[in-house]
């Protein structure tokens, strides 16, 4: 049973989340031969002030 957690900075629309979930699920089915009915996808939005790249917060 695959469990995929998508962490992302800033908001995504419901439509974007639906498309990402569909694509990730299809990829797991095609590449790893995991049934879509057992593939879970969750989304965690991280605020820009709580995410850093190259030592700098994204809200800078």
What feature does the model see in each segment?
Residues 2-60:
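A domain-level signal for the structural core that forms small-molecule/cofactor-binding pockets
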